[in-house]
Each structure stands twice: as structure tokens, then as C-alpha cells.
UniProtKB/Swiss-Prot annotation:
One of its GO terms (molecular function) is hormone activity. Cell signaling peptide that may regulate plant stress, growth, and development. Mediates a rapid alkalinization of extracellular space by mediating a transient increase in the cytoplasmic Ca(2+) concentration leading to a calcium-dependent signaling events through a cell surface receptor and a concomitant activation of some intracellular mitogen-activated protein kinases. It comes from Arabidopsis thaliana (Mouse-ear cress). This is Protein RALF-like 28. Residues 60-85 are annotated as: Disordered. Belongs to the plant rapid alkalinization factor (RALF) family.
Length: 85
């Protein structure tokens, strides 16, 4: 029975150490947050002042894709034979 008690005691100590280690790492993760200065001024062109900028245009215009059920991406499937053996 003493081996079982020692094993339980060891597991409790190991869990406590793991919890302390994880909680210390959580504080470091919270500190690595990107703020507004890190993001810069956005996608504006250099030298673009107020009122002198061309209008924004999307890089890739949206086009709705084709669904597989509509079969518009490839040839039609082969026709089924009329007689099934």
C-alpha cells in the first residue's frame, strides 16, 4: 500500500508543477498581442494624402463558383444504357 501512496503523492506533485508551468506560459502568450501601431496604416499607397488618393479597387473581384451538382466544370457524365443486364 505504501507504493500506491507514494505514486499518488508523486502524481499530485507532478500535476501541481505542470499547472504552475502552464500558468506561467499563459501570461507570456497574453503579452504577445498585436496592437494598432503594429498593423500600420493599412493598404494606402505611399505619398497618398487626404483627397489625392485614387479610389480603392478590390485585388480580386468576387466571382461565384460553380457547384458540383450543376456540372458546369467539366463534360457531362456518360449516358446510361437503356437495357440493364
Amino acid at each position: 500500500m505504501s507504493i500506491l501512496k507514494e505514486t499518488k503523492r508523486f502524481m499530485v506533485v507532478a500535476m501541481f508543477i505542470a499547472c504552475v508551468f502552464i500558468s506561467n506560459n499563459m501570461n507570456v502568450a497574453v503579452a504577445n498581442e498585436i496592437g494598432y501601431p503594429g498593423m500600420g496604416r493599412g493598404d494606402r499607397q505611399p505619398g497618398c494624402d487626404h483627397g489625392n488618393c485614387p479610389p480603392d479597387q478590390p485585388a480580386n473581384p468576387y466571382h461565384r463558383g460553380c457547384e458540383k451538382s450543376k456540372r458546369c466544370r467539366g463534360p457531362d457524365p456518360p449516358a446510361l444504357p437503356r437495357k440493364m443486364i
